[in-house]
Amino acid sequence: MTLREVSVATDLSDFYDLLVIGAGPAGMAAAVEASASGARVAVLDENPRPGGQIYREITRNSPDRRTYLGPDYWKGQPLAEAFCLSNVDYASRATVWSLETRDKTAGQARNVVGVTVAGSARMVETNAVVLATGAQERPMPVPGWTLPGVMTAGAAQIALKAAGAMPAGPVVLIGCGPLLYLLASQLVDAGVPDLTVLDTAQSPFRGAVLRHMPEFLLSPYVLKGIGLLLKVRRHAQVVYGVRSIAIIGSQHAESVRYAVGQGERSIPAKSVLLHQGVIPSTSLSNAAGCELQWNDEQRAFQPVTDHDGRTTKAGIYVAGDGAGIAGAQAAEVSGRLAALAALADLKLVSTQTSSTSIKSRHAQARRFLRGRAFLDALYTPRQSFLAPSAPETIVCRCEEITVRKLREAIALGPPGPNQLKTFVRCGMGQCQGRLCAATVTEIMVAEERKVSPADVGTYRLRSPVKPVRLAELAHLPHTARALKAVTGRDPVDHDTTETGHIL
């Protein structure tokens, strides 16, 4: 068996038993598990090669980058190799822009997925979809965050993994979370000089943190975490307890002004890397109508799922960080669990086989989840960064909506983010709210004070969840329904050329 690479949309089959969206650890694991049971499987992924964000370019990176990418990165190699040997259709550089469910009827698939590959779009039918779309960085709007030279820590790590590109110094990393220190450690190992970390985390001596410490000390993450912190403190300047940030510059980032203790300080900066944790990527699950719930520990919305990844929509499963932040190893296990659940629901494996495998995978998952609650509590962002207060700070980058404009609109009384769109175009740009949704919810909560994010809610998305060109839609087959919708005549009255154009 070997992977079948799909380079154009027409090479995809009309139907698959299981469609996996995303080729990170969860997506690759789900595909390997399902294909091994004989299911017809396709994987659709935006990246040029498998691996997702955590294992980006794992199939191509050279050993000379092993030093600074670290052992956790190379742990993904066996999974990537298994994926490349699996009997799966794999479409890279594929944009999935639609996921629609329909009532199950005889001879009809439950789900229809809209995807663009190599500039042409098509619809693919499947009875089961595993959403393995991973996580996205939580936005961190601060004054000056739209200046050239400012990017997220995740973007800098992508450049490091994909091309070995280093940020120009002086480099200032700002925020909190494990990824911030992982990137700082990788930059140290890569030889980047003049490195400063401005840690915005709250005090580690809070009750919520201390309560989970005993479990964390028994987790597989404790030694790794201590090692990262010690290395970064040895080789970089680390400032703890940072309460506010402003990035200064006219045409490019030039310095960072920050508040710590009782005063303010300023340091020069040419590259500023922002990060305050990651949150589940829920665009497709949201648009498909899957119920979302608020996770107060992770300060994020996530799909409602059972222990095996089933959502509230039959035939849709969520695996990996898209279901809740848990890390790469837990994501791999959850991908296998979601695939096993889908296979069982489709009756492609026996109940006894799936039950035995699922029980074994749950035992693995519990080990990788141990200590997660401690990390969530330790790196809960400060409210001042979740809901920025500086009036001219831009929240919605697409439409250039500032904190001031948002507050003025919120004062008019909209009950949630969707109604807020009536007053300002926040969330209506090309990213469709992916970069501002979390901040808008937090600002509305901060303004109301006595409500929870669960009460405020988040944007309700519709397909297409990604921008689609008219030329791409023109490549869609002219179905009977489409022809009648456009012309008002029954399909039998039309003559079409081989390319499908209406005559």
Curated annotation (Swiss-Prot):
<comment type="pathway">
    <text>Opine metabolism; octopine degradation.</text>
</comment>
<comment type="subunit">
    <text>Heterodimer of a subunit A and a subunit B.</text>
</comment>
<keyword id="KW-0614">Plasmid</keyword>
<comment type="similarity">
    <text>To T-protein and to dimethylglycine dehydrogenase.</text>
</comment>
<dbReference type="Pfam" id="PF07992">
    <property type="entry name" value="Pyr_redox_2"/>
</dbReference>
<dbReference type="Pfam" id="PF17806">
    <property type="entry name" value="SO_alpha_A3"/>
</dbReference>
<protein>
    <recommendedName>
        <fullName>Opine oxidase subunit A</fullName>
        <ecNumber>1.-.-.-</ecNumber>
    </recommendedName>
</protein>
<dbReference type="InterPro" id="IPR023753">
    <property type="entry name" value="FAD/NAD-binding_dom"/>
</dbReference>
<dbReference type="GO" id="GO:0016491">
    <property type="term" value="F:oxidoreductase activity"/>
</dbReference>
<dbReference type="InterPro" id="IPR041854">
    <property type="entry name" value="BFD-like_2Fe2S-bd_dom_sf"/>
</dbReference>
<comment type="function">
    <text>Oxidative cleavage of octopine into L-arginine and pyruvate.</text>
</comment>
<dbReference type="InterPro" id="IPR036188">
    <property type="entry name" value="FAD/NAD-bd_sf"/>
</dbReference>
<dbReference type="InterPro" id="IPR017224">
    <property type="entry name" value="Opine_Oxase_asu/HCN_bsu"/>
</dbReference>
<keyword id="KW-0560">Oxidoreductase</keyword>
<dbReference type="InterPro" id="IPR051691">
    <property type="entry name" value="Metab_Enz_Cyan_OpOx_G3PDH"/>
</dbReference>
<dbReference type="InterPro" id="IPR041117">
    <property type="entry name" value="SoxA_A3"/>
</dbReference>
